[in-house]
Each structure stands twice: as structure tokens, then as C-alpha cells.
């Protein structure tokens, strides 16, 4: 586990507009403050990802997403709560409560409550984070810090060290309304 002072330093950097890399359950991720438009667009440019595709928000607990859930049916809340924390991402209506640099062209946003201890600690300090796999578009996701550094040397503001969570595949993505799997995990 990464020492708390390193996580605190990463949190401070994120609050200052940094784009950082960090280990997740299966692959390395890139992240930043979702409310910092400049940081999000810098992340998208680094990754060569079109804004239209949208991004995932991760959190350390479901309460960090409460602002989105005001009119949600109990069934939806139960679906999410029964799979979190863990490698389950849900597509939920954003109800125009999030900017397009997060949602892209979609009427939904992808949400996940992580069970990776380092990322949970980071989210507990800064709130929800943008999270996307650490790879340029069209390249395999980084599974090592070395690969992150090869992909993004000089382009990101830091790397929060640590180990991957041991999963082989990224999270499953499901639609909250239908339960349909959009991406297998």
C-alpha cells in the first residue's frame, strides 16, 4: 500500500489541476478533478480521446454521487449498492447535472465506486475523480508503472505508485435502467 503522505500529495496536486496516473483494480488509470475543465481537456488531449466519448467518474463511496440520485428509483439504487465497491460501472442518467466534458454526447454518465485501497483513499480526500485507462487511444492499457511512463513521459503531472488490484479485466459496464451489459469485465 502507498503511504498516506503520497496519497495526500497526489490529492493536493489534483486540487491544483494535475493529471496523474494511479493503479486501479486491473489496469493503470489516468485521472483528474472532474470539475476542472482545463485538467479534463488536458487529460483527453494526452490520451488522444475525443470529448464526445465521455469519461468514467470513480468514488470511494456511493454518497459521493448522491447529487445525481435524487429522483432515482429504489431498484436502481439497490443495483448499484449491491455491486459497490467493486469492479462494476453503471451508466446512469446525468439529468444535465454534469458538464459535457465529463458526459460527452451521452445522456448517461459512467459511475463506479472503487475497491482499490489507494484510489479509495485518494477519492476520500478529493471526491469523485475522472478515471480512464492509462493508454493513448488504440494502444493497450498500461499494466505497469514503466508502461505508464513510456506512454506519457513529460505529459502528466505525476504517478501515484502502488500495485494493481489483481483483476485481469477492466470493470463491467452496465446500463442502470435495463441491467444490460455494455462491456464485459
UniProtKB/Swiss-Prot annotation:
Q: Does the keyword Nucleotide-binding apply?
A: yes
According to the UniProt record, what class of enzyme is this? transferase
- Decide whether keyword Transport is in the record: no
Q: Where is it mainly found?
A: cytoplasm
Keyword tags: ATP-binding, Cytoplasm, Nucleotide-binding, Nucleotidyltransferase, Transferase, tRNA processing
Q: Might you name a Gene Ontology BP term for this protein?
A: tRNA threonylcarbamoyladenosine modification
What EC number(s) is this enzyme filed under?
2.7.7.87
Sorted alphabetically, which InterPro entries does this protein's record hold? DHBP_synth_RibB-like_a/b_dom, Sua5-like_dom, TC-AMP_synthase, TC-AMP_synthase_SUA5
Its cellular-component GO annotations read:
cytoplasm
- Protein localization: Cytoplasm
What positions does the domain YrdC-like occupy? Answer: 4-185
The record's listing under Pfam families reads: Sua5_yciO_yrdC (PF01300)
Q: Which reaction does it catalyse?
A: L-threonine + hydrogencarbonate + ATP = L-threonylcarbamoyladenylate + diphosphate + H2O
List the molecular function annotations (GO) for this entry: ATP binding; double-stranded RNA binding; L-threonylcarbamoyladenylate synthase; tRNA binding
PANTHER family linked: SUA5, THREONYLCARBAMOYL-AMP SYNTHASE
Q: What does this protein do?
A: Required for the formation of a threonylcarbamoyl group on adenosine at position 37 (t(6)A37) in tRNAs that read codons beginning with adenine. Catalyzes the conversion of L-threonine, HCO(3)(-)/CO(2) and ATP to give threonylcarbamoyl-AMP (TC-AMP) as the acyladenylate intermediate, with the release of diphosphate.
Protein family: Belongs to the SUA5 family. TsaC subfamily.
Name this protein carries in UniProt: Threonylcarbamoyl-AMP synthase
Biological classification of the source: Bacteria, Pseudomonadati, Pseudomonadota, Gammaproteobacteria, Pseudomonadales
Amino acid at each position: 500500500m502507498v503511504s498516506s503522505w503520497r496519497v495526500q500529495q497526489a490529492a493536493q496536486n489534483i486540487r491544483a489541476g494535475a493529471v496523474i496516473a494511479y493503479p486501479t483494480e486491473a489496469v493503470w488509470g489516468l485521472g483528474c478533478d472532474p470539475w476542472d475543465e482545463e485538467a479534463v481537456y488536458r487529460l483527453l488531449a494526452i490520451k488522444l480521446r475525443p470529448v464526445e466519448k465521455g469519461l468514467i467518474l470513480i468514488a470511494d463511496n456511493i454518497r459521493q454521487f448522491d447529487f445525481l440520485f435524487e429522483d432515482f428509483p429504489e431498484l436502481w439504487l439497490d443495483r448499484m449498492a449491491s455491486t459497490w465497491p467493486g469492479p462494476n460501472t453503471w451508466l446512469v442518467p446525468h439529468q444535465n447535472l454534469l458538464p459535457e466534458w465529463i458526459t460527452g454526447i451521452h445522456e448517461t454518465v459512467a459511475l463506479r465506486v472503487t475497491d482499490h485501497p489507494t484510489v479509495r483513499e485518494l477519492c476520500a480526500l478529493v471526491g469523485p475523480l475522472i478515471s480512464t485507462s492509462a493508454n493513448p487511444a488504440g494502444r493497450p492499457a498500461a499494466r505497469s508503472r514503466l508502461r505508464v511512463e513510456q506512454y506519457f513521459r513529460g505529459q502528466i503531472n505525476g504517478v501515484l505508485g502502488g500495485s494493481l488490484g489483481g483483476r485481469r479485466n477492466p470493470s463491467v459496464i452496465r446500463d442502470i435502467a435495463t441491467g444490460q451489459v455494455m462491456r464485459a469485465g
